[in-house]
Amino acid sequence: MHGLLLAAAGLLSLPLHVIAHPQPSTNLAGRGVDLDAYRMADRSSYMNSDDMKLKQPGIASLSGGNYVDTATEVVKRMMPGMTFRMVDDHYVGESGISHVYFRQTMHGMDIDNSDFNVNIGKDGKVLSFGHSFYTGPAPDKAPVEKRDFSDPMKAFHGACKALSLPINADKATVQTMNEHEVMFMGTSGAMSDPQGKLCYMAKEDGTLALTWRVETDMGDNWLLSYVDAKETEKVHNVVDYVSHATYQVYRRALSPDPTEGKRESIENPWNLKTSPFTWISDGKTNYTTTRGNNAIAQANFDGGEDYLNNHRPNNKNLKFEYPYAPNMSPKSYIDASVTQLFYSANMVHDLYYMLGFTEKAGNFQVNNHGQGGKGNDFVILNAQDGSGTNNANFATPPDGKPGRMRVYIWTKAKPARDSSFEAGTVIHEYTHGLSNRLTGGPANAGCLNGMESGGMGEGWGDFFATAIRLKPNDNRNANYVHGEWVNNSPKGNRMYPYSTSLQTNPLVYTSCNKYNEVHAIGTVWGSMLYEVLWNLIDKHGKNDGPTPVFENGVPKDGKYLAMKLVMDGMAIQPCKPTFVQARDAIIDADMNLTKGSNRCEIWKAFAKRGLGVGAKYDPKNRTGNKGLPKDCQ
């Protein structure tokens, strides 16, 4: 393959900025429906490795044989008499942890929000597990036997009416896909044919509801609406897969924005260990445009769905070098914008791959070249997307379906600014894909839709963006603001800068009691992870290079070690985790990776901001605590 020359602005050094959604909103794109009112409760439990040894020694001592069999035995022992199925997405992660996922069933149908995940450590023993299984009364008969449910078309119309979805279904028909699953054919207004699935849903009041799960991809929202199967005007809950917020490019470790770097031409910037086909091939076809195995980038001025036929830069000599200056009008530099977005997303793909987000973990690639997982799911990157302004978002469907990033023009400055050039936006959005695929397993992309779990989704995006943004001379006194360039404001779009100073950033766990919005809650979580980051850097040093250096599978420096442990924690934690459970998962990740050598540094970071050993979750009245385990005092 010919060499590739990109004019790039630098990804991993871009100071990150952004948080998707500068103006926090969960309204259904332009239709005034508040999706927060339909969020599922965070109802999972998690037994960490320490508690399991004390409370479930029989489970903790299980080992030997096939890790799938061991995990299945855990579920049988913990949930005797209950029925369940294993989800076909189990895998052994790069840190040696085996992740196995189960879905509870009732009368042969899924309870769609009842999950069980088991983590087997690299020593072959059960590391931890989490679950949200339903333990209330069971219906005496299968609804299919009684035919005690509505026609799926009524449920589809019920979802459209309740959520004001602009879908025309006057001539729609129902096509049966398999038992309990249908497709609604002949509609218009959605980006693909809507689908329906008959399933149970565990309600907050401890009862079960029989529902039609109606899936509608509306572009800025990709919804799973749980419509009551009898009273089809009632929608119980809604999951949204969309998280709102030689190339001549800005290069410096992903330069944060055009004020912190200069554009330069970079030849063949890919890593063949993480992108063996390069960035401009999928192993079958070699491209001369911004398309490859990991991503496809293009302009999307009208905000539509037909990305394949949209404009993208093309050069038979693979020289993607185009003019750009912040004082130019956005459309005049669209080729530079698409090139920068393509570069940044691919750089993130390669870095996250090194840290463990591989094919079997559910990453985004067309061709998985026999490494596990489901392919055909690169990231669709829409530059200067016309469906909105002053924002960006990322849609994360289950493994095997493409992710979709929409990057908008920001109108807070004149001329307007293109967030393709702010790497923080791209990293933040791509990290939504990471956290949604890892939490609960690659086949379950709806595990971060609760208020606290959704907030952590925003916080992880900020954390990775900030960690990547760190400069060589930074120390723990460095403060970082998100979104200052696109927002045209030194305050950015967060309540406080990320800082280890409680005077500069006073957020603690109980601050979440005041907030009922995911970006605010996410800033609390991101602030805690920033403390973890600097505690580990102070202990292990900081690698300022664009990629980690490993020793026996462990990053040698504190920055990349923190990123690795946080990423491993995502895969360990249960579906719809709380702060407490996610904290425990990170500590368990360190136990597996380093035998717990960083346990106290991690505990001290969380305890500083009120998530110590006595912290307790209650959605309306969280209890903060700064206590440490005895061995860390």
From Swiss-Prot:
CDD domains: M36. GO terms for biological process: proteolysis. The keyword Transferase does not apply. Its EC number is 3.4.24.-. Residues 1-21 form the signal peptide. Coiled coil: none annotated. Glycans are attached at N286, N592, N621. One of its GO terms (cellular component) is extracellular region. It is an enzyme of class 3 (hydrolase). The active site is at E429. Its cofactor is Zn(2+). The keyword Cell cycle does not apply. It is found in: Secreted. Belongs to the peptidase M36 family. PANTHER family: EXTRACELLULAR METALLOPROTEINASE MEP. This is Extracellular metalloproteinase 5. It comes from Arthroderma benhamiae (Trichophyton mentagrophytes). The gene is MEP5.
